Amino acid sequence: MSTSFENKATNRGVITFTIGQDKIKPALDQAFNKIKKDLNVPGFRKGHLPRPIFNQKFGEEVLYEDALNIVLPAAYEAAVAELDLAVVAQPKIDVVSMEKGKDWEISAEVVTKPEVKLGEYKDLAVEVEASKEVTDEEVDAKIERERQNLAELVVKEDAAVEGDTVVIDFVGSVDGVEFDGGKGENFSLELGSGQFIPGFEDQLVGTKAGETKNVEVTFPEDYQAEDLAGKAATFVTTVHEVKSKEVPALDDELAKDIDEEVETLDELKAKYRKELEAAKEIAFDDAVEGAAIELAVANAEIVELPEEMVHDEVHRAMNEFMGNMQRQGISPEMYFQLTGTTQEDLHKQYESEADKRVKTNLVIEAIAKAEGFEATDEEIEKEINDLATEYNMPVEQVRTLLSADMLKHDIAMKKAVEVITETVKVK
């Protein structure tokens, strides 16, 4: 194989490489074997046409496209490796020449990783808003949330106030015509929760069980059902029950109900304080790490970031997100319907984040390279075992899912992040 690279512009160029007969002939054989089983030629049984007869009747050239598809991926990867290029995005392949009995010549327009000129990434000074301090108010708020979770709903005869739950039937109409999705029975609605469109819940404050009220509202202009957006609607609403929350007293009995490992409210407060301190410690460290990495990226210069890298990151993130949704039983169509968004909206959301992620990865990779970080066999094994434990998977399954190169890259990246953070100072 002969290879060459011609630089066309910053981070862009053309690879030209040849594919030798030692690779072409087996690929042609494979292409022929793939199609011969379907060949019907008079005088020969189906699938038993000899190769010389095939070449005579159809010409060997009809196999070239399939043969190229067979041999091209490995040949392209070999050319990239021989030229030691850091290629990103999919190449644009062109056939320069494909002549019988001669090596094939192929060209590939490629985009390469941009040069990263590192700035300061050690001994950085950063400011973060996160704090390690845990206040009494935060401890009390955590207990209050648990207390509210233990609250019971009790039917009352008095009029509903904000925070009460009403059990209602409702029928919605626009210009006197009922619409799909505008009807409900025995629906429990907490007043002030914001579950319904603006204005609906406010008008039920003051109602009592047995009352029927016409609730007049206007759908928001950006309402997900376009045929209702901006329109005035009337909901005939019948209140069946009004329920108020009864929360337990703030005492030692509450503490034991919340956590069976404690005996008193003071013990619960002490336990929650430790938990909050541990969580805040992690959040503080994460904030410092994030700020330090952001500063290291800002201090670096990336020479003309290729837009293809950003586009690829957008699609990677979108595919990952949609994959997670589908694993939860939510199809893309269902997600967009539930959120009132479109695929274009999601693309724009990820596009605004992708540029930052790509730049961050490039700078961390450059730091790893500058520091000469490599992963040892022991570190790779530890990473595999850690991942197996984290995801509750057999070690061998993790080993087959992740390539050694991927693990080496991830370990080197982690070491680079440690270099940034181990000397950082918080102002």
UniProtKB/Swiss-Prot annotation:
It is found in: Cytoplasm. GO terms for biological process: 'de novo' cotranslational protein folding; cell division; chaperone-mediated protein folding; protein transport; protein unfolding. It holds the Pfam family Trigger_N. GO terms for molecular function: peptidyl-prolyl cis-trans isomerase activity; protein folding chaperone; ribosome binding. It is an enzyme of class 5 (isomerase). Its EC number is 5.2.1.8. PANTHER family: TRIGGER FACTOR CHAPERONE AND PEPTIDYL-PROLYL CIS/TRANS ISOMERASE (PTHR30560), TRIGGER FACTOR-LIKE PROTEIN TIG, CHLOROPLASTIC (PTHR30560:SF3). Consists of 3 domains; the N-terminus binds the ribosome, the middle domain has PPIase activity, while the C-terminus has intrinsic chaperone activity on its own. Involved in protein export. Acts as a chaperone by maintaining the newly synthesized protein in an open conformation. Functions as a peptidyl-prolyl cis-trans isomerase. This is Trigger factor. It comes from Streptococcus uberis (strain ATCC BAA-854 / 0140J).
